């Protein structure tokens, strides 16, 4: 009789985490695993190869070769072979060039990587991509956010499930709107976005997928048809189906556990040299900051940071939801290049909501992500006695007080 080893707690925890994150029935749709060859992504691959078929789904993989290592092409091919051994199909290898993006090395790699993910989603019409971020990654992300001083949003870290609109600004290296996606299923319409759970489904999001219309092109996302600088806001009516979903089922699984999973399955994983390069902020936090915190404060620091992220997500998502509703009510589009916001309403609005409305107006109408400084400057326009009357924003956008309104418009003219 063939003896099968008893699964370990790490394997059981990871299977349970993935089962709890995915819909109960995938309706034979494809889910891609983002594979790098590292322990986390290999652990996600083997767990997904067990979980997803049991949810009536198919498993494939996308391997992104950043070309930053001399042997990166060979590593990508080895990862493909390993994925084939676990019957993943299809397996896509996407070769990207992060150096072409004018940003820092970490941001450039991320932008190029997400562009490759979108290409893979479009090419395969996959339901989702699974990313193998762990609890350790979440803790590091929270610390990175605190370093940047970006307020409560820095504490919420990464979401277990996020939708294409959240990250579509990375598509084609150009900013796009944060748009609420509309889902149609179970004979009723259900508005779900990255800040809400599905109101007509008892399971955590994402909602159950529908069979895809193969005659339809799902990418680029409709929100990405925006032109930089135009005052065109895309709302629920612009999207009539579900698009790409990014799922992080391992946010409660530690890096130690993913190593144990690889050990259980006899998988040799690749250690990316960049994960040891202290030029990168995340690496310094991982190897220099976190060990000190664990030694000086206690071994539960990363768990506390992860728990903080979950609590912060609940608070910030609720505030974002209220802000979106208020923006829907008060914003008036004056032209293709101008909107206005009533000063009286903003003055009566609590500061946390007011600042969010200002930021959302700039982002959703002009695809401009405002800094805290610019947001505060626009807020000063609400004060009639203040000496400031207009604010110059990035990408030739201007905010100006005229009468009882704040006007935001682009200096590029009608687009």
Curated annotation (Swiss-Prot):
Function, as annotated: Ligates lysine onto the cytidine present at position 34 of the AUA codon-specific tRNA(Ile) that contains the anticodon CAU, in an ATP-dependent manner. Cytidine is converted to lysidine, thus changing the amino acid specificity of the tRNA from methionine to isoleucine.
Which UniProt keywords are present, listed alphabetically?
A: ATP-binding, Cytoplasm, Ligase, Nucleotide-binding, tRNA processing
Record-linked HAMAP family: tRNA_Ile_lys_synt
Q: What is its main location?
A: cytoplasm
Q: Answer whether the UniProt record assigns the keyword DNA-binding to this protein.
A: no
Q: Its Enzyme Commission number?
A: 6.3.4.19
**Gene3D superfamilies (alphabetical):** 1.20.59.20, HUPs
Q: Where in the cell is it found?
A: Cytoplasm
Entry annotated with the keyword Ligase: yes
Q: What class of enzyme is it?
A: ligase
GO BP term (any one) = tRNA modification
Q: Enumerate the residues binding ATP.
A: 36-41
Present the record's domain note: The N-terminal region contains the highly conserved SGGXDS motif, predicted to be a P-loop motif involved in ATP binding.
User: What name appears for this protein in its UniProt entry?
Assistant: tRNA(Ile)-lysidine synthase
* An annotated Gene Ontology molecular function: ATP binding
Under catalytic activity, the entry for this protein gives: cytidine(34) in tRNA(Ile2) + L-lysine + ATP = lysidine(34) in tRNA(Ile2) + AMP + diphosphate + H(+)
Q: Which family does the record assign?
A: Belongs to the tRNA(Ile)-lysidine synthase family.
Entry GO terms, CC: cytoplasm
